[in-house]
Every structure is written in C-alpha cells, then in structure tokens.
Amino acid sequence: MTAHSFALPVIIFTTFWGLIGIAGPWFVPKGPNRGVIITMLVATAVCCYLFWLIAILAQLNPLFGPQLKNETIWYVRFLWE
C-alpha cells in the first residue's frame, strides 16, 4: 500500500512538470524574447519539480525521528492502554 501511495503522486507530478517543461515552449509566441521566455519556462519547471521531489523524498526517509524523554513515553503508553 505504501509503494502505491508514493508512486501515484510521483507519476502525476512528473507528468505535470514534464508537460510544462517540454510542451510549454511550443505555445510561446514568436518575438524578440522568445528564447528568454522558453528558458524561463523550462528552468521554472525543472526547479519546481526538483523542489517538490526533494521535499517528498526527505519526508519518505527522515534522518532522525522524534526525540522523546522517557517520562513522555511512559505517559503516552499509560494513556493509550
């Protein structure tokens, strides 16, 4: 269940930002700044995708867990039983 719940957002966001970065430049009108607009569009798609990917991967495998004192652990255990 976890692999499926992780794979679906990755596929959706990869497709979304891929379409913006690859298909978006096709719709930029011709003009003197066309190259700049295409560069900005592709750079924005890449940066937003990488920001999202790094954030989701950091949540998937955190470097450290919550730091609890022994008293807190015993109190939570007492309340949950």
Swiss-Prot record:
Q: Which InterPro entries match?
A: ATPase_V0-cplx_e1/e2_su (IPR008389), ATPase_V0-cplx_e1/e2_su_met (IPR017385)
Does the record bear Signal in its keywords? no
Q: What is its main location?
A: membrane
Q: Which residues are glycosylated?
A: 70
Q: Which residues lie on this side of the membrane: Lumenal?
A: 1-7, 57-81
Keywords of the record, alphabetical order, are: Cytoplasmic vesicle, Glycoprotein, Hydrogen ion transport, Ion transport, Membrane, Synapse, Transmembrane, Transmembrane helix, Transport
Ranges in coiled-coil conformation: none
Q: Which domain of life is it from?
A: Eukaryota
Keyword check for Membrane, yes or no: yes
Molecular function, one GO term = proton-transporting ATPase activity, rotational mechanism
Residue ranges annotated as Cytoplasmic topological domain: 29-35
GO BP term, example: transmembrane transport
Its Gene Ontology cellular component terms are: clathrin-coated vesicle membrane; synaptic vesicle membrane; vacuolar proton-transporting V-type ATPase, V0 domain
Subcellular localization, per the record? Membrane; Cytoplasmic vesicle, Clathrin-coated vesicle membrane; Cytoplasmic vesicle, Secretory vesicle, Synaptic vesicle membrane
Transmembrane stretches in the record are 8-28, 36-56
On subunit structure and binding partners, the annotation says: V-ATPase is a heteromultimeric enzyme made up of two complexes: the ATP-hydrolytic V1 complex and the proton translocation V0 complex. The V1 complex consists of three catalytic AB heterodimers that form a heterohexamer, three peripheral stalks each consisting of EG heterodimers, one central rotor including subunits D and F, and the regulatory subunits C and H. The proton translocation complex V0 consists of the proton transport subunit a, a ring of proteolipid subunits c9c'', rotary subunit d, subunits e and f, and the accessory subunits ATP6AP1/Ac45 and ATP6AP2/PRR.
Q: What does this protein do?
A: Subunit of the V0 complex of vacuolar(H+)-ATPase (V-ATPase), a multisubunit enzyme composed of a peripheral complex (V1) that hydrolyzes ATP and a membrane integral complex (V0) that translocates protons. V-ATPase is responsible for acidifying and maintaining the pH of intracellular compartments and in some cell types, is targeted to the plasma membrane, where it is responsible for acidifying the extracellular environment.
Protein name, per record:
V-type proton ATPase subunit e 2
Ranked from the top, the taxonomy reads: Eukaryota, Metazoa, Chordata, Craniata, Vertebrata
